[in-house]
Amino acid sequence: MDTNTDIKFRAYKDDKQKQYDTLNQDGGFYVESSQARGELIRMRKTDEFLNRINLVLVVRDMDNSIGLGSGKLIAARTDTAKGGTRIPRKINPSTGMPYECKQVNFDSAISYETMDAWAHHDDFNDCFEREMQKHANLDLIRVGFFGKETADDSDEALNPNGEDVTEGWIQALRDHREASILSPESEEIRIGEDGHYATVNEAVSAVKAKIAPRHRDVNDLIVLLGSDLVAHDAASFYQKRVDPKQPVHQIEMRQIKESYGAMPAFMPSCFPARGIMVTSFDNLSIYFLARAFRRSFGRRNDRLNRLESFESMSLCYIIEQLDKAAAIDFDAVKLNKSGVWK
C-alpha cells in the first residue's frame, strides 16, 4: 500500500470511527440500533431495485410479516337506521408470512493495488464505500431470487448464486403458496414456437394467472424478466437521460419498452436469466434485525497484500401478500433455438 493510500485510509477510519461512535478501528463492531436506518439508506443509494422495494427494520428476529396492503374490498354500505353496525375491515392480510432473520455474512477483500488506484481520487472515502456496498447489494439481490435454503456452511462452488445462503422470495412462494409457481407438467417448460407457450408474453400471462383475481387488475403490478427471455424476444430498453457531467453511482434497473401481460417489464440485476416474476415492487421486502448490523473498517493483511472486511447482518426475504406474487420455475425453462430446445 502506497504512503498516500495509507494516509487516506487512516483518515477514512478516523471519519468512520466518529460516525459510528466506536473506539474500535481494526476489529468488527455492532452498529447502534439508532443508526441502523443509515445502513438501509446506503443500500438504496447504490441500487435502483433496492430503492423500489421495502427495506424494513424489525426488532424481533422471529414473527409474522407486517403485511403491507391486502387488496381486500373495504368499500361498503350499512343501514345504521335499522340497527346495522359498521364494521371496519382489516387492510392487511389476515395471516402474514412468518419470518426469521438469519445471519448472512458479507466478507470481502480488496487488494492494495486497487486501493492505490482509488487514492488518486479526491473522493477516496466515497469510492471505497460504494465499491464495498455495490458488491454486497448485488449479492443481496441475487440471493433474494436464487436462495433456496440456509446451510450451516454455504458452498460457492456448488451454489454460485447463493442458493444455500438463505431462502429468497421465490423460495418463499414454494414454501408458503406453491400454487403461485408455474411448474412444468413434465420436466420442461418450453417457450417458443411449438412449445407450451408460443411467446414470452404468453408465458408471462400464464404466470400472472397464478396470482389472486383481486390483484390482477391493480395497476401497480409489474413483471420481472430474465436476460435470456429478453434476448429471445429481441426486446429493447428505455434509455434514461443521463447528465454526462454527473457521476452515476446507482446500479440501474433496466425497463423494457414492450409491455408483457399488460404490465410494465423490468430486468433487475442478478435476476435468473430465464426467470419470470409478477408482483408489485412494494410487495417485496427484506427485513433486517435492527440490532444485528455488524461492520468493520477493514483489516490490513500485509501477508496477502490486501484489506479484509468482515461484515454481517441478520435478514429475511418477505413477500407481504403471498397471493399477489407468482413466478415461473426458471430452472425448467427451455427456449427454441433454431428448432432445438435448449
Show which residues each predicted segment covers.
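Sequence/fold signature of self-assembling virion shell proteins
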Residues: D2-D47, D164-S186, D228-K342
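Short, structured patches in soluble enzyme cores that scaffold and shape functional sites
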Residues: I110-Y112, S227
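A general secondary-structure signal for short beta-strands and their flanking turns/coil
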Residues: C101-Q103, V218, L304-R306
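Assembly/oligomerization interface modules of large self-assembling protein complexes
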Residues: F29-A109, G162-G168
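Extracellular structured ligand-interaction cores
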Residues: G96, N105, E129, V218-D220
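Long, well-ordered mid-to-C-terminal structural blocks that present hydrophobic/aromatic surfaces
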Residues: D194-I256
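Short glycine-rich, low-complexity/disordered patches
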Residues: L23-R37, R142-S154, R216-L224
